[in-house]
């Protein structure tokens, strides 16, 4: 295929822990390869649509743009506008579908290519690609895998659209679900849940905002945990044991989980057993 590209990118955004403003990776790559970059500040006053018309595109490809395109813009390209979404639509429309798939303990997720429509993530499906979620896979690790899957699926989608062989299947809106953006209010671990729910919270909130727990009066970020076969009569959230294997915490119905990696305030991320060598934690 003989393809050429123009890029529309979001403006400068905070992209590190210091909230330093920088270009998006897409814009950086485009500039490095002398690909024209456009950054419309408004989408609904007609100027952005006129810009797209002037470019006379065959197709619009939208990935993680963060803004809904107006209907008149979607009608400009010969082949329409398509999107890559990191879930198996119509499940998990909206923000953070990857994280919520992990948080909810899903075993299967994937990516979807679809045509854009007036409402968010409601357009006709072109292709989907599935993958299993690892039991101890973080959202960040899953993101990296889905990113590659999405790129491969997008390549197939574009080639088949050009060839006229791409399918178009309306979504079953009765099966739709929506997920919200993450925030730090989700971080405190809810110990009065099953061990699997606790572990999925820990792995689902990485790399951000990260699960937290208060242990012996101090708040820790929790990065890794394991299942145990132990039972306890202690209340959820109680420290059952703390030693060479890690820190064992009571959950729902007397079951426990073992925290194996954490980070104390002002300290580096480390194994729980290493932290305990210099900072004993009281058993409840």
State what each model feature region is.
Residues 1-9:
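Short, small-residue-biased leader/transition segments that mark boundaries at the very start
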Residues 11-28:
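Glycine-rich phosphate-binding loop and adjoining beta1-alpha1-beta2 segment
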Residues 59, 63-178:
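Donor/substrate-binding cores of folate-linked one-carbon enzymes
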Residues 23-37, 62:
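Short, structured active-site "lid" loops
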């Amino acid at each position: 295929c003989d393809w050429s590209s123009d890029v529309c990118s979001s403006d400068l955004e905070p992209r590190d822990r210091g909230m330093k403003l920088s270009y998006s990776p897409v814009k950086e790559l485009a500039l490095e390869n002398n690909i024209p970059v456009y950054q419309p500040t408004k989408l609904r006053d007609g100027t952005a649509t006129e810009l797209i018309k002037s470019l006379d595109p065959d197709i619009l490809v939208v990935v993680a743009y963060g803004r809904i395109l107006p209907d008149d813009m979607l009608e400009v390209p010969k082949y329409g506008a398509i999107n890559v979404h990191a879930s198996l639509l119509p499940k998990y429309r909206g923000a953070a579908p990857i994280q919520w798939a992990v948080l909810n303990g899903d075993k299967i997720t994937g990516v979807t290519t679809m045509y854009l429509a007036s409402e968010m993530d409601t357009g006709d499906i072109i292709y989907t690609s599935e993958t299993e979620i690892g039991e101890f896979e973080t959202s960040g690790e899953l993101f990296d895998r889905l990113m590659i899957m999405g790129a491969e699926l997008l390549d197939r989608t574009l080639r088949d659209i050009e060839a006229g062989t791409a399918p178009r299947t309306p979504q079953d809106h009765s099966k739709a679900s929506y997920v919200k953006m993450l925030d730090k209010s989700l971080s405190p671990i809810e110990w009065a849940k099953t061990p699997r729910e606790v572990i999925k919270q820990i792995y689902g909130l990485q790399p951000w905002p990260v699960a937290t727990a208060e242990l012996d009066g101090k708040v820790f970020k929790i990065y890794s945990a394991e299942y145990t076969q132990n039972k306890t009569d202690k209340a959820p959230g109680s420290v059952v044991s703390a030693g060479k294997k890690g820190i064992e915490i009571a959950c729902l119905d007397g079951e426990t989980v073992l925290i194996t990696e954490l980070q104390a305030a002002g300290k580096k991320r480390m194994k729980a057993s290493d932290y305990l060598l210099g900072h004993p934690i009281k058993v409840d």
